[in-house]
Regions:
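N-terminal low-complexity/disordered regulatory or targeting extensions
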Residues: 59-60
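N-terminal amphipathic/basic-hydrophobic helices that include classical n-h-c signal peptides
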Residues: 1-18, 197
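Compositionally biased, low-complexity repeat tracts
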Residues: 8-11, 28, 81
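A short glycine/serine-rich beta->alpha loop
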Residues: 107-111, 255-258
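Conserved PLP-enzyme active-site core in the AAT-like
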Residues: 20-42, 49, 56, 66-67, ...
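Active-site-flanking structural segment that lines cofactor/substrate pockets
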Residues: 80-110
Length: 263
C-alpha cells in the first residue's frame, strides 16, 4: 500500500486530510489504535528521550571501540576462512582473541568454541588459577546456581572442593551494598582469588556498576595486593563505556550468547 493509497483511505473515512499527514499515524489508525493511545505513547517517549539518547550514544561508542580494535588488529577477509579446529596457525581464532584483548584492555584472551558456556569459562578460569590449599572468596554473596557444583557448595565430581580448594563468602548488607567490615575479616593468607559476580543473577539485589566494582577491588587489593580479582561480567559487557578490567580487575569472564553475541 503506497502513501497515496493511505491518504485516499483516510480521506474517504474522515474527510479532507492535509497532504503532510504522517503516514505512520494513518497506519496505526488503520489498525484500530486510537490517537489517544498514540499521544500517550508520544508523551512517554518524549519523557524518556534523554535516557534513550544516552543508551544510543553508549552503544555507538562501544561499537566504534570494537571497530577500532578490529582495525588495530588488521582484521580482513582472510580471518573468516573455515577452521578445522586444529590448534596451530588458526589465524582467525588468534586474531579474534587479539581483538577481544584490545577491546577489554587485557594482556590476552581466550575466545574459542572449546568453551561451551559462561559456566564452563568460569570453571576454566577458577581451576586454572587455584591450587590445593588455596581459598576462593566471594564478597558479593552466593554465586549463580550453576557454579555451586563447580565450587563444591553442592557435591560434584571434579569440584574445586574435591581438589582441596576451600570457599568462603561474605553476604551483602540488607541494602545490597558491600559489607566491607566482614570482607576485610574474610581475606586471609589462603585467599588466592576473589570472584565478583556483576549481575544480580537470580537474587533480588542490585547489579553492580563498574565504579562500584572498582571500589571493591581497590579495597581488597589494599588488604592483599597479590590476590587475583576476577569479575563474572556476564550481561555486563558494553553496558558502560568502561569495563571491570579498566578499574583493576585482573580477569573478566563472560558468555558469548549474551551481550558480545548480540542475542
Amino acid at each position: 500500500m503506497t502513501d497515496r493509497t493511505l491518504k485516499k483511505v483516510t480521506k474517504r473515512k474522515n474527510g479532507v486530510i492535509p497532504m503532510e499527514q504522517n503516514v505512520l499515524t494513518n497506519m496505526y489508525e488503520t489498525l484500530g489504535i486510537s490517537k489517544k493511545v498514540l499521544d500517550f505513547a508520544a508523551e512517554i517517549e518524549e519523557h524518556l528521550k534523554t535516557r534513550f539518547q544516552e543508551i544510543d550514544e553508549r552503544a555507538e561508542f562501544n561499537q566504534l571501540k570494537v571497530i577500532h580494535a578490529m582495525q588495530e588488529c588488521r582484521v580482513s577477509d582472510i580471518h573468516f576462512a573455515a577452521t578445522t579446529g586444529y590448534g596451530y596457525n588458526d589465524l582467525g581464532r588468534d586474531t579474534l582473541e587479539e581483538v577481544y584483548a584490545h577491546v577489554f584492555h587485557t594482556e590476552s584472551a581466550l575466545v574459542r568454541p572449546q568453551l561451551m558456556s559462561g559456566t564452563h569459562a568460569l570453571h576454566v578460569a577458577l581451576s586454572g588459577n587455584l591450587r590445593p590449599g588455596d581459598e576462593l572468596l566471594s564478597p558479593v554473596g552466593k554465586p549463580y546456581d550453576t557454579l555451586e557444583e563447580v565450587i563444591g557448595i553442592r557435591d560434584s565430581v571434579g569440584s574445586l572442593k574435591e581438589y582441596g580448594i576451600s570457599y568462603r563468602q561474605v553476604d551483602l548488607l540488607p541494602d545490597g551494598t558491600f559489607d566491607y567490615e566482614n570482607i576485610a575479616k574474610a581475606v586471609n593468607e589462603k585467599t588466592k582469588l576473589v570472584t565478583i559476580q556483576r549481575s544480580k543473577g537470580y537474587d533480588p539485589r542490585p547489579t553492580f556498576s563498574v565504579k562500584q566494582i572498582g571500589e571493591l577491588i581497590a579495597f581488597i587489593k589494599k588488604i592483599k595486593p597479590e590476590v587475583i580479582c576476577m569479575v563474572d561480567n556476564c550481561y555486563g559487557e558494553f553496558v558502560e563505556t568502561i569495563e571491570p578490567t579498566d578499574v583493576g580487575a585482573d580477569m573478566i569472564v563472560g558468555s558469548l550468547i549474551k551481550n558480545p553475541g548480540d542475542s
